[in-house]
Amino acid sequence: MLIVLSPAKSLDYKTPFKVKAPTLPEFVSESAKLITDLKKLAPQDVAKLMGLSDQLAALNVGRYRDWSKKFTEENSKPAIYAFDGDVYDGFDVKTLKPKAVEFAQDHIRILSGLYGVLKPLDLMQPYRLEMGTSFKNARGKDLYAFWGNRVTDSLKKALDKQKNPVLLNLASEEYFKVLQPKELDCPVISPVFQDAKDGKYKIISFYAKRARGLMARYVVENRITDPVDLKGFSLDDYKYYAAESKIDKPVFRRVERK
């Protein structure tokens, strides 16, 4: 089983980490092409393109300027430790045992606008470039055109090494769109997380994002390779709801929080 996650906008480059053997991203040369184009943008261009404040735009112009093809532990951090949003709050890598992190390296891929796809321990320099950004480049009008089949091909290679080739989609729609699922030639499972509110079950973005991270954690902690075992997921009081589930869209529900 291979999990795909979305990245996070929030980054943490301050908290220390211990990783014996960090790895390098697969598509550094492709990232460098994007950086070359991003370096041409003025802060006001970045602000307009990405809908950022002047302060955040200036921060990211600096990041593009400082980005280097050489990844070191001084300018980079393993992706799974660097991302700091709701998904990664749920995953909580800092409390995982080394063996679980090792399993994650083989069974998780993080989709990225700048890096294409990252393994958890791939060194990553800080950036902001969401996959849905309409950033014109030599290959087309946006990042989906830029990455083409590259990310899909990378995942296909990783899936071919899996004992049970199944893609567990814990990414957002924006990021999953970079893939061509049919070309993966394997089942794709996209769990749905619903919370009760005002007497109805619905997807609440903040909770759903965190639940994706929790499920990724559940998989790596329990070394799950068979999708049937996902039904046992019960972290943070979520429970499998068979009546609403489909094979490719298992539904997990949680009663209203008080």
Curated annotation (Swiss-Prot):
InterPro entries: YaaA. Pfam families: H2O2_YaaD. Signal peptide: none annotated. GO terms for cellular component: cytosol. One of its GO terms (biological process) is response to hydroperoxide. Belongs to the UPF0246 family. HAMAP family: UPF0246. This is UPF0246 protein Pnec_1068.
